[in-house]
Amino acid sequence: MPKQYLQLSNFAGGLNTKFDARDIKDDEITNVSNLQVYKPGQLFSSAPHTQVTTLAGTEPRLGYGIFLFKSDTQIDNTSALTEMLALADTTNSQIDIISDPFGTPAATYEIDLGTTTGGKYIYYYVDGALRTADANGGANNTANWYGFVKRGSSAFGGDINDWESKTNDLAAPGGENCGITDTGYAPTASNSGVGFDVDLSVSITDDDGLWEATTYEFAQSFVYEGDQESLLTTYPETVTLSVNNYFENVYVGLKSAFNERIKGGRVYIRKQGSNDLWTLFLDIDFERGVRKDFGAQDYHGFSATSGAAYSHTSFTDATCDTTNTDATVGHDDDDGAIKAGMWVTGTGIPTVPDATVSSVTSDTEFELSANATATNDPVTLTFHSGFTIKGPSIDTYESINGFSPDIGQISFGQSAGLFYKTVTVCNMRTFVAHVNYYKSTGSSEIKLMPDRILYTPPGKYDTFPPNQFIDIGINDGEDFTALESFGTKLLAFKNSTLYIIDVTSPDDMEWFLESTHNGLGVDKPAAVIRTEFGICWARKTGIYAWSPSQGIVELSAKLDKNLSPMTDITDPVIGYYPQDSHLLIIQNCGAASDALIYDFTTKSFTELGSYTSDAISNIQNDVDNTIFSLGTSIRTYSSAQGSTAWILETKDFDFGNPGVLKRPLKLIVSYSTSSGVTVTSNYYKDGDGAPDGLNSSTWATASNGGVKVIDLKGIGSVASLKFKFTATGNYQINDMTIVYRTIGKSPSTGQN
């Protein structure tokens, strides 16, 4: 028979341990270590991971602790796109923020979460702020908010332009020494940051007020970055209106300094002692001023002096005459501009409390609420005007926020020891699961609820009303372990079960459980990753992907669950490398481990042997890098060619004709290498379980077009033949050609 040729120029089918070595495709392989197969026509030795930076503190917990995020502002407050890396220091219960981790990395900030060590820190980043919590439930650790705040602040005479680290608590005003008064505002240090003073008068002269004649109570709130409103604190004072009365000369006074996350606040009103809804009375914005309701376009700006501020509009009159110890002030005709209740400032006007116009006695004279302290003829006085509020607003606390102010609690930063074990942001809401949180509406009881998912109102990523929850599989013997989202689908993983929930509708009453999948759960958040193709996850029994178009697909279908490398998956973490569309699965994050690489383009697996030398963190990626923490070193995955110890075992070739014997003559390998080393070649004959030695020699240095010819005549006749190659070096194999003759005899037991 003439010579025949079997050419193998593509190994992109990757690893296949599911089927018999004879039955797999020619482009598939039976065993591989440290060879990349994702480029058709090339098979090359892989590169090891490389160091990006090192940790200053102790390494993160297994499968937890690192997070990549980007900001438009650098740590030094310079406006420029920057990337940052959050690293957990579990010994000191801190998070180190590393700027420019892939350029010139530098530890620039530390976030302090408390005093309980050994935390499992998880993160989410949205609206320019990083949120951190201890999924391990450290009793003395508290959820944190870290973000850049840039805001003008006429209320305090200066702007905020800085990164802020704050407890992630949406605390209500303390309210100490803040009140509803009609004696003028005189802010003191005791008012600092605890709330808002409201100064007002009741108009009894006009008859066009729209308020019900009754006694009213008031409450105040803080508004935080992201327009997230706190619960309410009531004022001790009340105000009574008679028929047709209304409020006039309404001012807001405040004293710095507030938590930098607070951007303003609101004041509400309702009938005293009633269950009526709290109606908006004043909307306060530190940057723009105060308005009386959302429909009002005009803000009354703040004036600030020595850290105190009040809202107003104002005008001056340079014709005023004052007399020491006398409350009467004369002036030229002002055409009725000066009105009772106006706040008056100027030389000779008392300031504690601030004087107001108590009555206008004529076109050229008015009475102060207190005697002047100096005689001036003339003197310029400034008259400050507040709001006139003739009727109630249509806006209420519930209509603004979507929940009642009587909800009780709304944030994980409210108390140390509150936590969640997993988090994702989906359709403008934050979802957290397996929570230690307030049990129910209005309750202060904290309970661990492993079957509960909590979620925020739209756009309010730190606000968690206790009544906005999903309970699935209560007391089913499983806990929620991971959440991930894709589009408007929420994937909620328990230990063994996956729930897919449709959260498309803005109305949470229209959400529904789309499907339930048993046997597809995971053990931790780091076992799940979002990619451009969908959500991927790894568990001991397989590696899977879900997308809206294809549903659930087992990526590891060609890998036998009862054989290595699948049996080596014991504590997996998963990452994604966008540049080459690779999944990186490290099989055991708790010890030295091999890794699997899945290529989405070729739909193939390869294995990287001895990839990690110790326990690692979770895996993170940006568009260019995929990183993890190995000890105190941050390492990055590389898909490039490199020098390493590699193994390749081909399929068991029957040359397309298993029923006849073949006599192999030679093997021709086309390759390239920058430095030739010894490559050991072995063969398996007719499905033997143990290899026989074939050749061990140097494959010479060849930048291009290297050829290695290996004599096969000594093998004798075969029904099938498989090859194994091992080496430590930097090689690229382009193709293999087996030269053989068909003998024409049928194989028999013991035949050579």
Give the role of each language-model region.
Residues 200-211, 246-263:
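Conserved aromatic anchor
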